A protein has these predicted regions:
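N-terminal alpha/beta PP-like core and its mobile active-site loop of ThDP/TPP-dependent enzymes
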Residues: 1-296
């Protein structure tokens, strides 16, 4: 078994079974492994941004990571815009980026670049494989990193000689820490805020926009009389007949400020404190009304 096969086996063993790929010469051993190792479905895309965008959408809808396979630094660069979106949405993605053979890097061939520097701004985890024997373990670590709450983009850089050289057995899946629970004291504090009957808005985001989250928020609003709103742009929100459909916070700051006008307590449930998307003349960065207390 070579390094490429050990990587794909590690991925399949950890439950990653879809790869959105736009490969080149430095990824050919991995392309062969996609064919020889059962359990991984390869989807060819003709542009790297399609690979990263598809992986982002897949993660948002399934809650599990897909693998991307991209060609060197320029190929990664072509997919960075959608990795930015994925990072903002906390989407679990595992990028596998082929690189020059370790002994060929010094030649400074035309497509050689600093892949770590390109990957780092859009990734929550970056590693460069150093040997064929480390490849399976590195892949298992990348998958676990991508799934670590709240989810992140993990990028693994794989030199071509580490792919084609012999490797050891596939690595076992790593343990992934569970999502942290809200402390009991925080729940008690929010309950006190709601019982105070001051003008209160709950701003929903993240997992609060699941079916269970929306229904729970609607029950809280019905009992307390608070207003429900969602972030302007959500990673995912459940929709359908009978599902609560809170108002979205408007995009433009004037409208957002008007929507939150009069709110004295703003409770953030999976959401960030709202800010304007750009700096506008004469308007604030923060959309929290003046004098409003933010509770988390």
């Amino acid at each position: 078994m070579n390094g490429a096969e050990s990587l794909i086996r590690a991925a399949v063993g950890a439950g990653v079974d879809v790869c959105f790929a736009n490969p080149g010469t430095t990824e050919m051993p991995l392309v062969a492994a996609l064919d020889s190792v059962e359990g991984m479905r390869a989807v060819l895309a003709l542009f790297e941004g399609v690979c990263t965008g598809a992986a982002d959408g897949y993660a948002r809808m399934t809650g599990k990571p897909a693998m991307t396979l991209l060609h060197l630094g320029p190929g990664l660069a072509n997919g960075l815009a959608n990795l930015h979106n994925a990072r903002r949405a906390n989407s679990p993605i595992v990028n596998v980026i082929g690189d020059q053979a370790t002994w060929h890097r010094a030649a400074d061939a035309p497509l050689t670049s600093d892949i770590v520097s390109l990957a780092s701004p859009m990734s929550g985890w970056v590693r460069e494989t150093k040997s064929p024997g480390a490849l399976a373990g590195d892949m298992a670590d990348a998958i676990a990193a991508s799934l670590t709450p709240p989810g992140k983009v993990a990028t693994l850089i794989v030199p071509s000689d580490c792919q084609w050289d012999p490797a050891g057995d596939a690595a076992k899946p790593r343990a992934v820490p569970p999502r942290a629970k809200v402390a009991g004291g925080t729940v008690d504090n929010i309950a006190k805020v709601l019982r105070a009957k001051q003008p209160t808005t709950i701003l929903l985001g993240g997992h609060a926009l699941s079916l269970a989250g929306l229904k729970s928020a609607a029950r809280v609003a019905a009992i307390s009389g608070c207003k429900l709103m969602t972030e302007t742009f959500t990673a995912r929100i459940e929709r359908g007949a009978g599902i609560p459909n809170p108002m979205r916070l408007p995009y433009f700051p004037e409208q957002a400020l008007e929507a939150l006008k009069g709110t004295q307590k703003l409770i953030l449930a999976g959401a960030k404190s709202p800010v304007a998307f750009f700096g506008y003349q004469g308007l604030p960065s923060s959309l929290v009304p003046e004098g409003c207390a933010v509770e988390t």
